[in-house]
């Protein structure tokens, strides 16, 4: 593996990576849009020029279509959009200059004759505005706009929304950190009959503060009877269309000798610019294929035995569509997802982070991914000649947020780690621009992915021994973390044995996973399992752990009736309106879970295998996350059952 890594260090071209990021980021790549289609065509043309076999697969984009557990939506085409403050003759938004200045998927509207702008200065509380007439007016709000759609637009008749909301992230960014940027916002329409057809515009915090000041001045002047109206006037237009259309998935292939395949995924979507998120992942994926092909063509590397595939798709949406065709589920041995992999590691930009598999999907793919990161990190010699990393990187426990979640669902069965980057100061904003990209960091991510797919495509016993050695390191780390949790008081005494058994089971099953992809001798697997058992038993003795039995509070066993995780429970509830009260109960319980809620929802589905009781599922998740969640799990399985997504055994 080290020799292959060295070849890749020479073959991967940072300048080429940077150029592709630049080109991809020039397209406004909203899911199911003409701009996304143009970006997909660019990627296809680039692959063609490199002599790499590729195709574009199209799928229907219409609200009556479901792919696995993901409901589709209309295609959106934006020609132009602008918003002007008439009283000051100031252009507030211009989508041709900055496409993020419109709330994506806005419906068409023409109010060039002017309408009143109502500043809702008291936040999202309908009671504060019960005496204010919003009919036919545009509202100006300072917080997340979504909560205003139902009451201000649907009930009180506002026609549109202006917002200067900037998502803050504790410890990473405040509103003032991105004072002149704009938040990436979008409507995610369900296209139900009673859904309002509205539009919206986005301001920077700086422009929003100025507009709020002018609105307040106008109101005070009106109260002093110096103005005829309490409201300023705005005019504007949104020239857009929503209609049944298509989404595209770009698939590229380095053919192998067998029908088995390994996969790289990277989402191609997001607004114009959006360089780290995720033009970086797209660029790295293309460069993986180019660099491997060039090395194989030059005779430096042997041809890949398994087929190597890349898919570039709309995030989640394209993955569900792609996997809905069973041919894409067959014979995929493993995958790696690239999402935000090239940001300059300066202020508020974190390490390149490998996100591990969930423990519900045990596989050696975890250890292979982290080992590939180590090899890619051999970038430059230190003063004693040892190769060390110029790139900050880490490997962390499973969390959600990107397409690896779909692949790693046990019902899909494609073990997939992710390379990402967090923190990212400019995440989902207008300032995720080309200047945040570091070609050398991006090259590190590219080399990691290239080594991963090439090794898995040609896996042999020598590789397995290297990966097993890395598994020993990773197991030792997990055991040390458990000991630290005990010291920190994060694990109760009765929980420690459950935690260690959980770790032992995961690593044991991961050791057995080699049989899935290689005809390995049983003796080598048994030796590895014995090493794992001994290591865990030693930690049990070190911590003076007494075996404890699980206290079963709920012995019900449920089995899923669907493939792939549910993408939106809201969409599922629209199919089963009688489940709304159970959904609301579940949501109330989930609020107590904080930032881990998204990951928790995935894990609950992954452990729902028709064998574990509700209490056992809650115990597994507590071992994974240290979150006590029994009540949440109970509420969740009852909600799924009411929507016929699970059955009690």
Language model features with spans:
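Short alpha-helical segments that sit at the start of domains
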Residues: 570-602
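Soluble metallo-hydrolase cores and metallopeptidase-like ectodomains found primarily
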Residues: 76, 99-128, 187-278, 287-307
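Extracellular/luminal Protease-associated
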Residues: 93-193, 197-199, 273, 277, ...
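Catalytic-core environment of secreted peptidases
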Residues: 14-36, 44-54, 73, 137-143, ...
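Noncatalytic luminal/extracellular "stalk/propeptide" segments of secretory-pathway proteins
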Residues: 2, 11-15, 19-135
